[in-house]
């Protein structure tokens, strides 16, 4: 497979998407069978996924690249990969938005973190009920107490107190105890 990709590049055309996917799977299989070391396999997969996100920018490749970075303990690269997927509007799950927001907070980017959460709250997806077939349009990031607290914290850290207060008030109304009112 590596030879086919190399020959395609030498001849001046872009190798097929499936070739890269197959090559990444081969490295994963060789790693699992302990034929090659995990570090080498992960390095090879990173190179392949970096090509895939550039030539064929699909969500699955961004997530696979990010996951590989995580396995290599390259958290900054993982965050940047998630951010790139976000910038391309490829994220469509609450956990993806919240993971990116939390990583941005860890890297002291609270304003961006808040923007990511708000974007997730504003993004609408259609959910289909398997039993009834009814469709419902919902926000990707739900307005739950925990999420609202995270958003309020991000706004506060970004010195956007006027944006944090209404969010905290909403979270406090959802709270089962009075702790949120103290914040």
Regions found by a protein language model. Name each.
Residues 1-183:
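Alpha-solenoid helical repeat scaffolds
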């Amino acid at each position: 497979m590596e030879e086919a990709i190399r020959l395609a590049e030498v001849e001046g055309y872009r190798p097929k998407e499936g070739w890269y996917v197959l090559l990444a799977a081969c490295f994963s299989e060789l790693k699992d069978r302990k034929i090659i070391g995990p570090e080498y396999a992960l390095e090879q997969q990173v190179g392949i996924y970096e090509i895939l996100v550039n030539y064929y920018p699909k969500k699955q490749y961004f997530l696979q690249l990010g996951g590989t970075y995580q396995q290599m303990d390259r958290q900054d690269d993982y965050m940047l990969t998630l951010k790139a997927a976000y910038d391309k509007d490829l994220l469509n799950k609450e956990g993806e938005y919240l993971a990116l927001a939390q990583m941005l907070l860890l890297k002291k980017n609270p304003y961006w973190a808040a923007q990511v959460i708000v974007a997730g709250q504003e993004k609408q997806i259609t959910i289909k009920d398997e039993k009834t077939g009814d469709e419902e349009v919902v926000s990707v990031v739900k307005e739950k107490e925990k999420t609202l607290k995270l958003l309020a914290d991000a706004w506060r850290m970004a010195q956007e107190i006027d944006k944090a207060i209404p969010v905290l008030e909403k979270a406090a109304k959802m709270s089962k105890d009075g702790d949120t009112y103290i914040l």
